[in-house]
């Protein structure tokens, strides 16, 4: 290769690099497969200050809030466009009993969070509070039910509580707690991966069969 050809080759490579650097692609209006927005979903668990002091401070807090939900956190979650939010865990889901988190807050059962630090929780953030959080964010709720220490019946009644339009005893509890209409939950998880024991597999089989 002579010097002239070498200079031309170098010039062409430089131009190619420059062109590649400014290449832009606009797919607007093009047809094709769409990415399911729910892959960008988020996860909330009773761990550290994720729930208490995080998304939830209570109605009587000096921290700005709407119905107990921290205004700044809700605004941040709305800004990033959370499509779906999972709760109550995680590991915590498999020790959470939903009936402890409904009804008047002053009478709710206190519990020890054995998964995360052994802290005592007052269950002031329960099903209704989670649904309120999702309403404020504008996302779909995703509830992960207790299979590790719960029963199939407990899970079934939680779904009934959230979604049934009938007038069963379970649904009447929802009415008494201020929510006449069902929550219309679309996404339900079945336990967490750390609890895959023979008992878990048995319960999962019963749930799947139902």
Q: Could you say what each language-model-derived stretch is?
A:
Residues 9-10:
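Low-complexity, intrinsically disordered or signal/transmembrane-proximal segments
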């Amino acid at each position: 290769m002579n010097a002239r050809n070498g200079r031309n080759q170098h010039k062409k490579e430089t131009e190619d690099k420059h062109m590649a650097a400014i290449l832009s692609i606009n797919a607007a209006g093009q047809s094709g497969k769409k990415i399911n927005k729910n892959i960008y979903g988020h996860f909330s668990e009773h761990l550290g200050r994720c729930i208490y002091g995080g998304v939830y401070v209570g109605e009587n807090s000096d921290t700005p809030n709407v119905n107990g939900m921290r205004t700044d956190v809700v605004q941040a979650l709305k800004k990033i466009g959370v499509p779906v939010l999972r709760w109550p865990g995680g590991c915590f889901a498999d020790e959470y009993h939903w009936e402890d988190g409904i009804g008047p807050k002053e009478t709710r059962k206190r519990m020890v969070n054995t998964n995360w630090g052994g802290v005592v929780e007052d269950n002031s953030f329960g099903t209704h509070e989670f649904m309120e959080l999702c309403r404020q964010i504008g996302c779909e709720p995703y509830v992960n039910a207790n299979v590790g220490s719960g029963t199939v019946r407990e899970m079934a009644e939680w779904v009934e509580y959230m979604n049934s339009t009938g007038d069963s005893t379970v649904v009447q509890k929802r009415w008494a707690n201020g929510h006449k209409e069902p929550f219309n939950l679309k996404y339900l998880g079945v336990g967490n991966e750390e609890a895959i024991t023979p008992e878990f597999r048995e319960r999962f089989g019963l749930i799947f069969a139902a």
